[in-house]
From Swiss-Prot:
There are two types of cytoskeletal and microfibrillar keratin: I (acidic; 40-55 kDa) and II (neutral to basic; 56-70 kDa). This is Keratin, type I cytoskeletal 25. It comes from Homo sapiens. Belongs to the intermediate filament family. Residues 1-78 are annotated as: Head. Residues 115-136 are annotated as: Linker 1.
Length: 450
């Protein structure tokens, strides 16, 4: 199904507007052209059912609203009724617009005539001097311009303040992220400092141990020297044939040199280990700083992406809300139309029930009258046979079997020699020839036979 509504444009429109609305649900589209004041809306309803088309024209010469429907077994009866209702509503709307335009034109003609009659330069010479109002008008114009300028400045200041606040917010977020990264770096360096402090404590303990050992060796050396000096201070002369003794001074000097070399080697090893650890820590710190910078940049990009996605989400939510509102409005309109149609259906059903009731009543009356007619015809035939087949007497009774009217009288003779029985059938009919009541009167007269 394809549906298209097009509208024309008014030439005298000061600000034309253009809008379009497309609904994709079975190929339905609505399009509106430039319009203002709705001086003329042109469209045409044409429905193609196996190749036929139709169109309308209303609204003071403007084409009437319409639809183009291509139905190939896909259009149900409800949709036909809906499109017909839409067509009728659009036609009535165009009629009201045309009436309003005519009323506006009439008012414009009246205003123009009044100005021609009573305005400045009219034929009566009623010229008015409005020069005293010009300064007031200029003053008011200046005030309006000043107010507009001040409002524009205020709006500009508000926008600038909003932009400044946004900039400060971004700066605050960046500084907060930088502060957090620096705090993380400081915490990492504190752990490194604790490790270095532990290493320094171990080295101090080793230094104290070596110092105590050196002090102990010095003390032993001093005691040995004192013992040797005391032994050398006596006058005992002992001559011995023995190997030459060991020079203790040289031995102590050698031992001192070895310990000093050992201490220097330990110091160099500790310094090299410390430098190696410090270099590795510096390299790790530099790598962590680079990783932190890249992570900070990535975090900034992610924040920007998050803001963009939030904006898109807000726009999609607004679109969803507007679509829900339009859907609710459409449902309410169709529910109102459905309620109106149901009310009309109920009224028609009530009328149909009333018509059926009246028809049944008329049927019963007709059956009763038909029974009366048949009964009277049988009586007439019986009376004719009793009379003796006298057609003239039967015909002169003033009764016809197929004629019922107000005041019809049938006279039949039961026994011509003894008595005459007269039966009167009285019927009351209304203006529409409807039989209201039927009454049968029997009169018996006795007479002598000739």
């Amino acid at each position: 199904m394809s549906l298209r509504l097009s509208s024309a444009s008014r030439r005298s429109c000061p600000r034309p507007t253009t809008g379009s609305l497309r609904l994709y649900g079975g190929g339905t589209s609505f399009g509106t052209g430039n319009s203002c004041g709705i001086s003329g809306i042109g469209s045409g309803f044409s429905s193609a059912f196996g190749g036929s088309s139709s169109g309308g024209n209303t609204g003071g010469g403007n084409p009437c609203a319409g639809f183009t429907v291509n139905e190939r077994g896909l259009l149900s009866g409800n949709e036909k009724v809906t499109m017909q209702n839409l067509n009728d509503r659009l036609a009535s709307y165009l009629d009201s617009v045309h009436a309003l335009e005519e009323a506006n034109a009439d008012l414009e003609q009246k205003i123009k005539g009044w100005y021609e009659k009573f305005g400045p330069g009219s034929c009566r010479g009623l010229d008015h001097d409005y020069s005293r109002y010009f300064p007031i008008i200029d003053d008011l114009k200046n005030q309006i311009i000043a107010s507009t300028t001040s409002n524009a400045n205020a709006v500009l200041q508000i926008d600038n303040a909003r932009l400044t606040a946004d900039d400060f917010r971004l700066k605050y977020e960046n500084e907060l992220a930088l502060h957090q990264s620096v705090e993380a770096d400081v915490n990492g360096l504190r752990r490194v400092l604790d490790e270095i402090t532990l290493c320094r404590t171990d080295l101090e303990i080793q230094y104290e141990t070596l110092s105590e050992e050196m002090t102990y060796l010095k003390k032993n050396h001093k005691e040995e020297m004192q013992v040797l000096q005391c032994a050398a201070g006596g006058n005992v002369n002992v001559e011995m044939n023995a190997a030459p003794g060991v020079d203790l001074t040289v031995l102590l000097n050698n031992m001192r040199a070895e310990y000093e070399a050992l201490a220097e080697q330990n110091r160099r090893d500790a310094e090299a280990w410390f430098n190696e650890k410090s270099a590795s820590l510096q390299q790790q710190i530099s790598e962590d700083v680079g990783a932190t910078t890249s992570a900070r940049n990535e975090l900034t990009e992610m924040k920007r992406t998050l803001q963009t996605l939030e904006i898109e989400l807000q726009s999609l939510l607004a679109t969803k809300h507007s679509l829900e509102c339009s859907l609710t409005e459409t449902e309410s309109n169709y529910c109102a139309q459905l309620a109106q149609i149901q009310a009309q259906i109920g009224a028609l059903e009530e009328q149909l029930h009333q018509v059926r009731t009246e028809t049944e009543g008329q049927k019963l009356e007709y059956e009763q009258l038909l029974d009366i007619k048949l009964h009277l015809e049988k009586e007439i035939e019986t009376y004719c046979l009793l009379i003796g087949g006298d057609d003239g007497a039967c015909k002169s009774g003033g009764y016809k079997s197929k004629d019922y009217g107000s005041g019809n009288v049938g006279s039949q003779v039961k026994d011509p020699a003894k008595a005459i029985v007269v039966k009167k059938v009285l019927e009351e009919v209304d203006q529409r020839s409807k039989i209201l009541t039927t009454r049968l009167h029997s009169l018996e007269e006795k007479s002598q036979s000739n």
